[in-house]
Design a protein with these regions (language model features):
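Thiamine diphosphate
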Residues: 1-306
Length: 306
């Protein structure tokens, strides 16, 4: 995902000198071409995330289109006050990129497990929250976020699912359908969409036709797609590599409650309200915390009493 984002940034910066990239002393391998091509538009601020957001806000208020980059929790939790008071309060044109959503850096332990970010940031006014489901979406997302203006959070995974394609246009605030089905709708955000896709294929063996939706835009969220899932399928299952409290499942629930609609079946799949203290690779941790395709299948079979 990261490579696609950087390639898009390079293409955009060729025609727009106002695009500025700030990094918190990370990403050198992929930023070399950007730095050499646009030396006046690239700054390594060091391991100083609070200063990075402050600098980004100042540049944005002077008309620059700023992108900040760090990994996982570093570019969010270390500088949450600055994101709130500087960037969001001033509705500054800053796209905050965090590479390594969910368990992407699983082997580095809970300090690098990014599992509360969506819940925290979507509660702030004046910020969009986007978690691309595929590498192609990541490239489309950075372009849309910069062009739309305002403060945005772009959550990237280190992995990207294979065999996931949609003909729907990428629009912030709209989702994409990857498979059609009438019995249940699987709504996923981020690269864990791949697990939902695999599960949908296996569920056919049990007579369950699952619609698969990639909800890359969590804020603003696609309420129309949620309404359609409630009206035209047998229920909703949300799937996220994130704490269930405050994440995608909560956002979908809020839409249903606000609109007074009730899915026939409803299930949230994600991390329970706990710290992921186990160390391991992304796929291992998905399995350990019951959010891989096998766990998705078993949980859906259970709600269908199979």
């Amino acid at each position: 995902m990261r490579d696609n984002v950087v390639n898009e940034l390079i293409n955009l910066a060729k025609n727009d000198k106002d695009i500025v990239l700030l990094t918190g002393d990370l990403g050198f391998g992929v930023f070399e071409k950007f730095e050499s091509s646009f030396p006046g538009q690239y700054f390594n601020v060091g391991v100083a995330e609070q200063n990075m957001i402050g600098l980004a806000t100042g540049l944005a208020l002077e008309g620059k289109k700023v992108v900040t980059y760090s990994i996982g929790n570093f570019g969010i939790l270390r500088c949450l006050e600055q994101i709130r008071n500087d960037a969001c309060y001033h509705d500054a044109n800053i796209t905050i990129i965090a590479n390594g959503g969910g368990f992407s850096y699983g082997s580095l332990g809970m300090s690098h497990h990014t599992t509360e970010d969506i819940a925290i940031l979507r509660s702030l006014p004046n910020i969009s929250v986007v978690a691309p489901c595929t590498a192609d979406e990541a490239g489309e997302a950075i372009t849309s976020m910069i062009m739309n203006g305002g403060t945005g959070y772009l959550r990237l995974d280190k992995s990207s699912p294979k065999d996931c394609s949609s003909e729907d246009l990428f629009v912030i605030g709209k989702s994409r359908r990857y498979k059609e089905g009438k019995d249940i709708t699987l709504i996923a955000t981020g690269s864990i969409l791949g697990e939902a896709n695999i599960a949908s294929v296996e569920l056919k063996k049990f007579g369950i036709q699952a619609r698969v939706v990639g909800m890359h835009s969590i804020k603003p969220i696609d309420a129309d797609e949620i309404i359609d899932a409630v009206s035209n399928t047998g229920g909703i299952v949300t799937i996220e590599e994130h704490n269930k409290d405050g994440g995608l499942g909560s956002a979908v629930s809020e839409v249903c409650m606000d609109l007074g609609i009730k899915p026939n079946k409803f299930l949230r799949i994600g991390l329970d309200n706990q710290y992921s203290s186990i160390v391991g690779g992304q796929q291992y941790l998905r399995s350990k915390y019951n959010m891989d395709s096998k766990a998705i299948i078993n949980k859906i079979k259970k709600i269908f009493k199979l």
